[in-house]
């Protein structure tokens, strides 16, 4: 049986939470391998709504859930999320949740820096202000505080001093007060016992599970178009969101990551700043926003909406090595008489079939559309392909042709069971 790696193939918010929740019912282990608590997702299980940002979706199913070394972890947020889910009846014990002992921590000074930079910048990136970017900077700069450091208070003190020496200059330049080393140390020591109860060498646990033949589901956050290398830079997140990160961010070899499932909305959305060639500002855009309930789980920010962009998704299919996609929110298109799919970009007097890396070309790109007849019948709640109307089926098939990948799963509502299985990712 194959393991499965789930990645967003657009700008995030594609419905990964529901799909991972659906797949985790058939998995033994669920792993987060990058990002932080900047990308929330909503799960609806038996009518109960769970909002997660850092915990792997498998916790709701009672599956072994791992926060890998590629994730940057705000320990205060993690404990808050654990408590919130516990209040909903799901106890998150150390037997259920494993936190990689070599994962790096997000600290209050990272949030301060993130928010101050965004406020001072004339070019807004659209950061959530939760400290993810600055935490990754410290990780790459080899000055981060890691989970394992909490177990050695004496060694932690000089690490904090070194970290604050770096941040001191940054804070002064942004008009922020000096951070207090003792206060940070005391705050970390206060939560250390509880955080350390979840800490283990995650790579070792995963290696043992893999060798035992257990099904592993790798859960990506954000989307491929937000990847720090392959996304619409600089309007991106601070981590690699592509499928290749599943290996590096979990401690497992590339051969273990299995079937790559890209999650794709039947239209396109984006939060924050940055290029969006197929964005809509008309009544159709309002329809997608309203019917699709396009508001960020974490931030409450309205998402920008547009037609399905096959150019971008085809690019994501190539970069991630996607074997199949889960097409979500098909039901949001119900009632639209005419649908459009972006099949290319006009830049000056040229038409291209990919999104260039340069900001000037990205800003100049105007969409080339193909029109498809819509439908008035409802697709909401459909659980079989034969339940879909002819035009909805034509739309799905055309999407497959344009992106160069088959639709493996089709989602027709936020409910877990309103999912059509067309190809089992766990069968490879």
Curated annotation (Swiss-Prot):
GO terms under biological process: 'de novo' AMP biosynthetic process; IMP metabolic process
Lineage: superkingdom: Bacteria
Pathway: Purine metabolism; AMP biosynthesis via de novo pathway; AMP from IMP: step 1/2
GO CC, alphabetical: cytoplasm
Binding site for substrate: 297-303
Binding site for Mg(2+): 13, 40
CDD domains linked to this entry: AdSS
MF annotations from Gene Ontology: adenylosuccinate synthase activity; GTP binding; magnesium ion binding
Pfam family, one: Adenylsucc_synt
Compartments where located: Cytoplasm
Keywords, ordered alphabetically: Cytoplasm, GTP-binding, Ligase, Magnesium, Metal-binding, Nucleotide-binding, Purine biosynthesis
Catalytic activity reported: IMP + L-aspartate + GTP = N(6)-(1,2-dicarboxyethyl)-AMP + GDP + phosphate + 2 H(+)
Cofactor(s) the protein requires to work: Mg(2+)
Co-factor remark: Binds 1 Mg(2+) ion per subunit.
Catalytic residues as annotated in Swiss-Prot or TrEMBL: 13, 41
Annotated PANTHER family: ADENYLOSUCCINATE SYNTHETASE
Family: Belongs to the adenylosuccinate synthetase family.
Subunit structure: Homodimer.
Protein name: Adenylosuccinate synthetase
């Amino acid at each position: 049986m194959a393991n499965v790696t789930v990645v967003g193939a657009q700008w995030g918010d594609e419905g990964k939470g529901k799909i991972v929740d659906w797949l985790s019912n058939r998995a033994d282990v669920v792993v987060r391998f990058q990002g932080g608590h900047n990308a929330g997702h909503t799960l609806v299980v038996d009518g109960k709504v769970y909002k997660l940002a850092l915990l792997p979706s498998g916790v709701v199913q009672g599956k072994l859930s791992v926060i890998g070394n590629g994730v940057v972890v705000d320990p205060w947020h993690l404990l808050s999320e654990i408590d919130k889910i516990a209040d909903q009846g799901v106890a998150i014990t150390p037997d259920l949740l494993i936190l990689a002992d070599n994962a790096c921590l997000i600290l209050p000074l990272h949030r301060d820096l993130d928010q101050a930079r965004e406020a001072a910048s004339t070019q807004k990136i659209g950061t959530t202000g939760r400290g993810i970017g600055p935490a990754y900077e410290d990780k790459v700069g080899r000055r981060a505080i890691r989970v394992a450091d909490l177990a050695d208070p004496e060694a932690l003190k000089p690490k904090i001093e070194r970290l604050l020496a770096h941040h001191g200059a940054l804070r002064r330049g942004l008009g922020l007060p000096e951070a207090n080393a003792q206060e940070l140390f005391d705050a970390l020591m206060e939560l250390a016992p509880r955080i350390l109860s979840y800490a283990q060498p995650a790579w070792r646990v995963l290696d043992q599970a893999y060798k035992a033949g257990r099904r592993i589901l790798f859960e990506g956050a954000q989307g491929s178009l937000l990847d720090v290398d392959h996304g619409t830079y600089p309007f991106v997140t601070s981590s690699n969101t592509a499928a290749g990160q599943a290996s590096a961010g979990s401690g497992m070899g590339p051969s273990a990551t299995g079937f790559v499932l890209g999650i794709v909305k039947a239209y396109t959305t984006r939060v924050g700043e940055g290029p969006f060639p197929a964005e809509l500002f008309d009544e159709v855009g309002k329809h997608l926003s309203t019917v699709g309930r396009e508001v960020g789980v974490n931030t409450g920010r309205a998402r920008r909406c547009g037609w399905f962009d096959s150019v971008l998704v085809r690019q994501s299919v190539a970069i991630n090595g996607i074997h199949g996609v889960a097409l979500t929110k098909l039901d949001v298109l119900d009632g639209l008489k005419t649908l459009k799919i972006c099949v290319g970009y006009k830049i000056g007097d040229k038409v291209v079939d990919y999104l260039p890396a340069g900001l000037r070309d990205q800003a100049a790109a105007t969409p080339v559309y193909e029109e498809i007849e819509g439908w008035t019948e409802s697709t909401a709640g459909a659980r079989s392909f034969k339940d879909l109307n002819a035009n909805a089926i034509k739309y799905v098939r055309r999407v497959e042709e344009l992106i160069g990948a088959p639709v493996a799963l089709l989602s027709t509502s936020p409910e877990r069971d309103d999912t059509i299985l067309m190809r089992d990712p766990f069968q490879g």
